């Protein structure tokens, strides 16, 4: 089973599920105030966040999945020229290593526990609220990945540098230090016996 290691300016984290930023992190973390609603809290807060939609400017840099030997620079250091870079306004950024982030969320249908890659789902700010609703309604079945506004990048490592304020970093459902974060897959880090 693969794990992933994340690094912020102050801390390192291990993970095996997802990293989210943008609307997914906003919904997950801000909906804690209505935890009494159970799983419905995510749906309620997603509607609220779509009505009051936020976009965040960021620089997303990634190494394609073919890069197996990764030497990650410190989060403060420059990246080498083999990293691909996208700078834009985003609604959603979701790096996945598993098919389901929750029982009712088929967020990354093509992920497997040992494929050695992140599947990073990105939605840019050009996506309308109506299109975002259509996409979210298909997350339970995995149909959202067929939507035109849904971009998926397969990579072995990434760095996300928020260029606007107010966003959250969310690893496996928990808030971590905001700001620049980078992650890399640690292939076959755990062996499981059935």
Model-derived regions: residue spans:
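Catalytic core of DAGKc-family lipid kinases
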Residues: 1-98
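ATP/nucleoside-binding phosphotransfer catalytic cores, i.e., glycine-rich phosphate-binding loops
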Residues: 81, 85-87, 104-194
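A general structural motif
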Residues: 99-103
């Amino acid at each position: 089973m693969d794990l992933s290691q994340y690094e912020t300016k102050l801390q390192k984290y291990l993970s095996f599920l997802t990293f989210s930023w943008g609307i997914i992190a906003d919904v997950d973390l801000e909906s804690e105030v209505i935890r009494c609603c159970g799983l419905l809290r995510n749906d309620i807060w997603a509607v609220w966040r779509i009505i009051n939609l936020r976009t965040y400017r960021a620089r997303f840099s990634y190494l394609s999945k073919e890069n197996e030997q990764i030497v990650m620079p410190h989060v403060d250091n420059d990246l080498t020229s083999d990293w691909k870079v996208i700078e834009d306004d985003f609604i959603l950024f979701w790096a996945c290593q598993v098919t389901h982030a929750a029982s009712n969320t088929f967020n990354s249908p093509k992920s497997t526990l040992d494929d050695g890659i992140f599947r990073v789902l990105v939605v840019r700010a050009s996506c309308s609220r109506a299109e975002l609703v259509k996409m979210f309604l298909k997350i339970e079945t995995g149909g959202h990945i067929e939507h035109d506004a849904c971009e998926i990048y397969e990579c072995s490592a990434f760095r996300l540098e928020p260029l606007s304020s107010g966003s959250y970093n969310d690893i496996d459902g928990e808030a971590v230090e905001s700001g620049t974060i980078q992650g890399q897959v640690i292939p076959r880090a755990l062996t499981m016996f059935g």
